[in-house]
UniProtKB/Swiss-Prot annotation:
This is Lambda-crystallin homolog. InterPro entries: 3-OHacyl-CoA_DH, 3-OHacyl-CoA_DH_CS, 3-OHacyl-CoA_DH_NAD-bd, 3HC_DH_C, 6-PGluconate_DH-like_C_sf, 6PGD_dom2, NAD(P)-bd_dom_sf. The lineage of its organism: Eukaryota, Metazoa, Chordata, Craniata, Vertebrata. One of its GO terms (molecular function) is L-gulonate 3-dehydrogenase activity. NAD(+) binds at L19, I20, D39, E100, K105. The gene is CRYL1.
Length: 321
């Protein structure tokens, strides 16, 4: 079996042909890997391949296609498959992308466990399901982990690597190297935790944003500006810990200077919101003024978002670290 560090990439199986699965297929193909895109419904695979061709051609025309290969070369590396054993055969890595349902994913990994060899990595794209629940009882558990991407993975490079308690260190190392090879930014979680790292941070922000709107402190539109034109601009380049470090004479100076103030404010934070009722309706109406919730407007806004993310990714790539 080829390894991510070899000169000739091997094969990757992507299980699930939805938006996340298609993004993974594009990423692996951009680095020269042969990709088998599996779905239990053959029509879904056919539709996915048509969608991939359209998107990759558009990316090439706009100059945002990743990798050194042209769109046609990358597309030639992606094939559809509706037989799971055939999809996995010869693969160095399997990336699962089925809907976020524990029983569905457990059933799939039980099938993969029966046909996997002792070398292939079995990876889930789950955003919140714990590896200890996903991979419990599998014979190949040492080869299993979660590799959680950020939506959309083609435009946002972060991938959280979350091991099962029995995952072999080499499995994490190989997956880390593979993610780097396809242009992603992997981070290692040293142990599993509910929500992983990204969603725990995201949910903390969402909860306080909701409370501020619910308590009449700020409007939904202005709340979003606090992030998009404030914190978000910094966080696109440096994280919260480095921000602290730079906003004083180092981290210890920041903690000494602002620690008591932070604790005072944090003690005023309210309980976990219900995310329903009058506040939900208020936020919904405010969002619909900006982006109506019909399919056409939402798709157009997502396309605008993806274009912004791609331009930002290119800018970050050009800037010195």
């Amino acid at each position: 079996m080829a390894s991510p560090g070899s000169s000739a990439p091997g094969g990757v199986a992507v299980v699930g042909s939805g938006l996340i699965g298609r993004s993974w297929a594009m990423l692996f193909a951009s680095a020269g890997f042969r990709v088998k895109l599996f779905d239990i419904e053959p029509r879904q695979v056919t539709d996915a391949l048509v969608s991939l061709r359209k998107e990759m051609k558009m990316l090439e025309l706009s100059g945002y296609l990743k990798g050194e290969l042209g769109a046609e070369e990358q597309l030639s590396l992606i094939s559809g498959c509706s037989d799971l054993r055939e999809a996995v055969e010869g693969a160095l890595h399997v990336q699962e992308c089925v809907p976020e349902n524990l029983e569905l994913k457990r059933k799939l990994f039980a099938q993969l466990d029966k046909i996997a060899d002792d070398h292939v990595i079995l990876s889930s794209s789950s955003s919140c399901l714990l590896p200890s629940k996903l991979f419990a009882g599998l014979a190949h558990v040492k080869q299993c982990l979660v590799a959680h991407p950020v939506n959309p993975p083609y435009y946002v490079p972060l991938v959280e690597l979350v091991p099962h308690p029995e995952t072999a260190p080499a499995t994490v190392d190989r997956t880390y190297a593979l993610m780097r090879r396809v242009g992603q930014s992997p981070v290692r979680l040293l142990r599993e935790i509910d929500g992983f790292a990204l969603n725990r941070l995201q949910y903390a922000v969402i909860a306080e944003a909701w409370r501020l709107v619910e308590e009449g402190v700020v409007s939904p539109g202005d709340l979003d500006l606090v992030m998009s034109d404030g914190l978000g601009l910094r966080y696109a380049f440096i994280g919260p810990l480095e921000t602290m470090h730079l906003n004083a004479e180092g981290m210890l100076s920041y903690c000494d200077r602002y620690g008591e103030g932070m604790k005072r404010v944090l003690k005023t934070f309210g309980p976990v919101p219900e995310f329903s009722g009058a506040t939900a309706e208020k936020v919904h109406q405010a969002m619909c003024v900006k982006v109506p919730d019909d399919a056409e407007h939402l798709a157009a806004r997502r396309a605008w978002r993806d274009g912004c993310l791609m331009r930002l990714a290119q800018l970050k790539h050009q800037l010195p670290q």
